[in-house]
């Protein structure tokens, strides 16, 4: 069995203790029984010299024995190196702390870094005349009560920081949820825009197609009316004109048969009878009749020509109506394309906002994860420091108890 003091670097084995005791006992030899008190005093003095203690020879008034006063243990080089590594780790952890952490945690880390250094790293005014680093604040190791209290305070602050981390993580999670809901709303908005564009484009195209069909039907009606009112009378006039022309030439006139009379007697008002011969061949027309037919022929031809002109005008009007119908239908298609383009532009803007919301969601989740990881690292570091402080204090207490027990025996 051996007794180890971690903070001071002292390691005393049973063999060493036996050697120290035997050293006192060998000097006495056979007088050990008679001179028990002196041997024990010399053994205690030798033990105190090994562990770095200062012996003050004080004579007890009653028993006449020496009292031993233990001096402050001096840390070994191994303990200093351990303390330096601990401080370096705390400094790195302090630099990792984000500005959004609780001020109590950041301040506690800073205080520990400033106050906790290895005993060899800071010189007191009694060691070389140098002042303490960091002002007049005393430097101490974890083995001292103040350092242990500071680590306990750090643990309490870290426990308080857990609540702050949870609140912040909840806020970041809520932000990510809101971003996700906004992205879903953008999806619904895109679907609604597509449906609106489809309905509006279909309605516009249907209306323009109907309007174009109506105009084309009007054009066809104009053509039908022109045929009925212009071409039909024109045909009748042409037929009558042709018949009159045949009569002027003496064709198709009535011809007398052989048994009919060849003359007509006409009695005038004076009582005188006048005989008129009838041309049996029907080859001649009276001059009066021929004159009337000849005067009416140009007027009939003019009416025939006017019917033709009005028919052509009606055809032009019908063509314009049909063209108007085609333009209305084409305009409906153009309007539908414009609606589709506007809907596509709106959908593009909605998709851009959706991507922004998704990016915000990912950023919030990443920030929450990073903050949780940083808080976890900070808690682990604080817990390790607290465990190290507890272990070192426990070791020091055990060593002190063992030494005190050995001195009593």
Swiss-Prot record:
<feature type="compositionally biased region" description="Basic and acidic residues">
    <location>
        <begin position="370"/>
        <end position="382"/>
    </location>
</feature>
<dbReference type="InterPro" id="IPR005427">
    <property type="entry name" value="BipC/SctB"/>
</dbReference>
<keyword id="KW-0843">Virulence</keyword>
<protein>
    <recommendedName>
        <fullName>Effector protein BipC</fullName>
    </recommendedName>
</protein>
<comment type="similarity">
    <text>Belongs to the SctB/SipC family.</text>
</comment>
<dbReference type="GO" id="GO:0005576">
    <property type="term" value="C:extracellular region"/>
</dbReference>
<feature type="region of interest" description="Disordered">
    <location>
        <begin position="330"/>
        <end position="396"/>
    </location>
</feature>
<keyword id="KW-0964">Secreted</keyword>
<dbReference type="Pfam" id="PF09599">
    <property type="entry name" value="IpaC_SipC"/>
</dbReference>
<feature type="region of interest" description="Disordered">
    <location>
        <begin position="268"/>
        <end position="287"/>
    </location>
</feature>
<feature type="compositionally biased region" description="Low complexity">
    <location>
        <begin position="360"/>
        <end position="369"/>
    </location>
</feature>
């Amino acid at each position: 069995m051996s007794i180890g003091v971690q903070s001071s670097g002292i390691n005393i084995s049973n063999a060493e203790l036996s050697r120290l005791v035997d050293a006192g006992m060998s000097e006495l030899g056979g007088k050990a029984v008679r001179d028990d008190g002196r041997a024990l005093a010399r053994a205690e003095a030798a033990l105190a010299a090994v562990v770095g203690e200062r012996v003050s020879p004080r004579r007890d008034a009653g028993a006449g024995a020496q009292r031993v006063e233990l001096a402050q243990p001096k840390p070994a080089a191994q303990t200093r190196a351990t303390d330096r590594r601990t401080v370096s780790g705390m400094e790195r952890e302090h630099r990792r702390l984000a500005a959004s952490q609780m001020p109590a945690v950041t301040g506690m880390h800073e205080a520990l870094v400033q106050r906790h250094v290895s005993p060899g790293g800071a010189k007191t005014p009694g060691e070389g005349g140098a002042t303490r680093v960091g002002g007049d604040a005393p430097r101490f190791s974890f083995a001292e009560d103040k350092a242990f209290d500071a680590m306990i305070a750090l643990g309490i602050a870290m426990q308080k920081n857990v609540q702050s981390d949870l609140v912040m993580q909840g806020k970041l999670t809520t932000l990510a949820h809101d971003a996700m809901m906004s992205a879903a709303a953008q999806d619904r908005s895109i679907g609604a825009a597509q449906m609106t564009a489809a309905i509006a484009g279909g309605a516009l195209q249907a209306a323009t197609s109907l309007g174009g069909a109506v105009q084309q039907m009007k054009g066809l009606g104009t053509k039908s009316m022109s045929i009925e009112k212009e071409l039909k009378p024109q045909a009748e006039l042409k037929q009558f004109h042709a018949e009159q022309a045949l009569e002027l030439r003496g064709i198709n006139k009535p011809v007398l048969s052989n048994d009919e009379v060849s003359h007509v007697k006409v009695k005038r008002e004076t009582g005188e009878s006048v005989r008129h011969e009838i041309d049996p061949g029907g080859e001649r027309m009276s001059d009066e009749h021929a004159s009337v037919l000849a005067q009416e022929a140009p007027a009939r031809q003019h009416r025939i020509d006017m019917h033709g002109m009005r028919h052509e005008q009606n055809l032009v009007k019908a063509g314009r109506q049909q063209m108007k119908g085609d333009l209305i239908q084409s305009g409906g298609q153009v309007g539908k394309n414009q609606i589709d383009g506007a809907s596509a532009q709106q959908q593009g803007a909605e998709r851009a906002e959706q991507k922004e919301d998704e990016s915000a969601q990912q950023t919030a989740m990443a920030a929450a994860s990073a903050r949780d990881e940083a808080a976890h690292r900070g808690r682990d570091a604080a817990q390790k420091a607290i465990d190290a402080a507890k272990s070192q204090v426990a070791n020091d207490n055990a060593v002190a108890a063992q030494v005190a027990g050995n001195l009593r025996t």
